[in-house]
C-alpha cells in the first residue's frame, strides 16, 4: 500500500523539525511518530500506484468497448429504420 520508507522519511523530517529539547527523546519519539503516521494512513482508503495504473487501463479498455458498442447499436438502428421504410411485398398490389 504505502512505502514504509516514505513513512520513515516523513517521521524523520517531523522529528528533525522539532526543537532540540524534544528531539532528545530520540528514537522513541520517532517510533511513536512512525506508528501514528502508519495508523492514520491505513485508515485512508488509498491504492498503490500500480493498482491505480491497472484500473486506469481497465477503464480505457471499457470506454473503447463502450464506444464500439454504441457505434454498433447506431448501425443496427439505422439498418432497422431502412428496413421499415421499404414497402412490404405482401401489401403491394400484384403486378401483371
UniProtKB/Swiss-Prot annotation:
Major subcellular location class: cytoplasm
GO process annotations (BP): ubiquinone biosynthetic process
UniProt pathway annotation: Cofactor biosynthesis; ubiquinone biosynthesis
Assigned keywords, A-Z: Coiled coil, Cytoplasm, Ubiquinone biosynthesis
Name of a matching Pfam family: BMFP
Top-level division of the source organism's lineage: Bacteria
Protein role: Required for efficient ubiquinone (coenzyme Q) biosynthesis under aerobic conditions. UbiK is probably an accessory factor of Ubi enzymes and facilitates ubiquinone biosynthesis by acting as an assembly factor, a targeting factor, or both. Dispensable for ubiquinone biosynthesis under anaerobiosis.
Protein name: Ubiquinone biosynthesis accessory factor UbiK
Source organism (scientific name): Escherichia coli (strain K12)
Organism taxonomic ancestry: Bacteria, Pseudomonadati, Pseudomonadota, Gammaproteobacteria, Enterobacterales
Amino acid at each position: 500500500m504505502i512505502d514504509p520508507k516514505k513513512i520513515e522519511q516523513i517521521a524523520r523530517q517531523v522529528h528533525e523539525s522539532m526543537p532540540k529539547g524534544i528531539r532528545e527523546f530520540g528514537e522513541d519519539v520517532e517510533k511513536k511518530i512512525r506508528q501514528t503516521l502508519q495508523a492514520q494512513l491505513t485508515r485512508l482508503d488509498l491504492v498503490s500506484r500500480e493498482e491505480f495504473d491497472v484500473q486506469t487501463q481497465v477503464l480505457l479498455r471499457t470506454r473503447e468497448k463502450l464506444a464500439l458498442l454504441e457505434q454498433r447499436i447506431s448501425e443496427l438502428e439505422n439498418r432497422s429504420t431502412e428496413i421499415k421504410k421499404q414497402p412490404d411485398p405482401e401489401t403491394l398490389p400484384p403486378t401483371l
